[in-house]
A protein has these predicted regions:
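Conserved beta-propeller blade repeats
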Residues: 1-30, 37-39, 58-80, 110-129, ...
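Short glycine/acidic-enriched loop and turn motifs that connect beta-strands
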Residues: 32-36, 84-87, 132-135
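Hydrophobic/aromatic beta-strand patches that form the interior of the parallel beta-sheet core
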Residues: 78, 148, 168, 195, ...
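Multi-bladed beta-propeller domains
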Residues: 1-19, 42-68, 84, 89-114, ...
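Cap/lid segment of the alpha/beta-hydrolase catalytic domain
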Residues: 154-273, 280-281, 314-315
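C-terminal substrate/ligand-recognition segments
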Residues: 128-129, 133, 172-178, 202, ...
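Active-site-proximal cap/loop segments of hydrolase catalytic domains
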Residues: 228-377
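Non-catalytic accessory segments flanking enzyme active sites
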Residues: 89-186, 211-214, 218-219
Length: 377
């Protein structure tokens, strides 16, 4: 077993490696009854958690980082990562590996998501990767103290023409703190705005290099990527309130996106008369919901690979809750979502232009529902 989930409570448990203090135990990233995911020592024979090694109060432990030399220290966990604003930060357990990382961070231009792809047995040669908002992906060679560029994954893109990404925190209309990321064009405010919710919806945003955000910023748009309720890495409570525990059938998820746009207007960064929403998959669904909202704050929306009739998605979660003994209240929330948050049912209320993009052989979000929605407009 590498990964399990308590489906009724949405808790996660996955194996990261072996405990160096006791090889009979495992190192696992899990909730273990807590709101935030942490790194634990776990006894597989007794099926018991033994010790909490690291956990944060403001977010989940994200992943583990392994020793860069797989020849001499294969499988050794040297750090755990977590999101600190936009940055992917580390809690280090190995001083030597931290020193290497700090050195690389000081010499790599636009250092961001730094990885060591491979390292020689003697440790003197390293192939390093970097990726971030101002670097779509570059590989380097560090050999016997000499540092040089191997090449870029997107050589046609210049860092000087790419935009910065910053983390923001704003307050939703019910007082909940919502985090997000803004990509800012190299011009002066107020900017036209694209609200770009991630897909899923129950995943998290990786705020590194995003082709859509950078393309839009290059054309003068500010881009907001809101981490609305249901996004991962901010704890179970934040995750579950998307559709249970008072999630109000998805209304708050949509409010979180709109409130981010209004926050940027209030700050003088965005022109309220030039705002739109654009998303893919669940983000496309959210864009269709936005097109029928009242009061309307957007001038248009783009929906890619959307699901105008969410019955399949809702049935998936309903069946999962039924199989795992989920609460009646949670299932009722899903039923309310199906009834009140269906773009197909709201087609007559659409009050702004819509651009729909959809693959005619898409299997994950079949186009049948989109064709039905277009006829209903």
């Amino acid at each position: 077993i590498i990964y399990t989930r308590n489906r009724a409570e949405f808790e996660e448990f996955f194996i990261a490696g072996f405990d160096p203090e006791n090889p009979d135990n495992l190192l696992v990233i899990a909730h273990n009854g807590n709101d935030k995911r942490g790194l634990w020592s776990f006894d597989p024979k007794e099926k018991k958690f033994k010790e909490l090694i690291y956990r944060r109060s403001d977010g989940d432990v994200f992943r583990t980082r392994f020793h860069s030399n797989r020849f001499t220290n294969s499988g050794d966990i040297t750090a755990v990562s977590y999101y600190d604003g936009r940055e992917l930060s580390y809690e280090w357990f190995n001083g030597e590996e931290k020193a290497i990382y700090d050195q690389l961070k000081s010499i790599i231009p636009y250092a961001d998501r730094i990885g060591i792809s491979s390292r020689s047995r003697d440790g003197n040669s390293l192939i390093i990767s970097n990726r971030g908002p101002r670097d779509p992906g570059t590989y380097y060679l560090l050999k016997n103290g000499e540092f040089k560029v191997i090449g870029s994954t997107k050589p046609g893109l210049s860092s000087e023409h790419l935009a910065n990404v910053e983390a923001i925190t704003y307050e939703a209309r019910d007082g909940r703190k919502i985090r997000g990321f803004i990509t800012t064009p190299n011009s002066k405010p107020p900017y036209p705005l694209v609200v770009m919710p991630h897909g899923g919806p129950f995943i998290g945003e990786n705020p590194g290099f995003n082709e859509w955000a950078q393309m839009l910023a290059n054309r003068g748009f500010m881009v907001l990527q809101p981490q609305y309720r249901g996004s991962k890495y901010f704890g179970l409570d934040f995750y579950k309130t998307a559709f249970i525990n008072g999630g109000q059938g998805g209304y708050q998820m949509q409010d979180d996106k709109d409130d981010g746009a209004l926050y940027l207007v209030e700050k003088g960064l965005v022109d309220p008369n030039r705002m739109m929403m654009f998303g893919w998959s669940y983000g496309g669904y959210a864009s269709l919901i936005a097109a029928a909202r009242t009061p309307q704050i957007y001038q248009c929306v783009i929906a890619g690979a959307s699901f105008p009739d969410p019955i399949m998605q809702v049935n998936y979660y309903r069946n999962r809750l039924n199989r795992s003994g989920g609460s009646t209240a949670a299932i009722e929330q899903l039923n309310m979502w199906l009834k009140s948050m269906s773009p197909l049912e709201q087609a007559a209320e659409v009050n702004i232009p819509i651009l729909i993009v959809h693959g005619d052989v898409d299997q994950r979000t079949p186009p049948k529902a989109v064709r039905k929605y277009i006829k209903a407009l």
